[in-house]
Design a protein with these regions (language model features):
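A short, Lys/Arg-rich alpha-helix, primarily the initiator
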Residues: 1-18
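Short, charged recognition helix plus adjacent turn
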Residues: 33, 62-69
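DNA major-groove recognition helix of helix-turn-helix/homeodomain DNA-binding modules
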Residues: 45-60
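The alpha-helix within a helix-turn-helix
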Residues: 10, 21, 51
């Protein structure tokens, strides 16, 4: 399972979805789905834009969690 930490990162920085969308040019719906961990696919350019904007590495944004067998 892949866990997205966008909501945690945005919460720590007190960022709003609308502000991130406006500042990055990423569709608000895309950010909302990532924030709520409902996104099933995310374009690499979106990930790159978010990492650049937030000044984080991809490993800070996403984490692979092993599920029990």
């Amino acid at each position: 399972m892949v866990k997205c930490h966008l909501s945690t990162i945005m919460g720590e920085r007190r960022l709003k979805i609308a502000d991130v969308s406006r500042d990055t040019g990423i569709n608000r719906g895309t950010i909302t789905r990532m924030y709520n961990e409902e996104a099933t696919r995310v374009d690499l350019d979106v990930i790159e834009s978010l990492c650049t904007y937030l000044k984080i590495d991809i490993g800070d944004l996403y984490q692979v969690i092993e599920e029990p067998a």
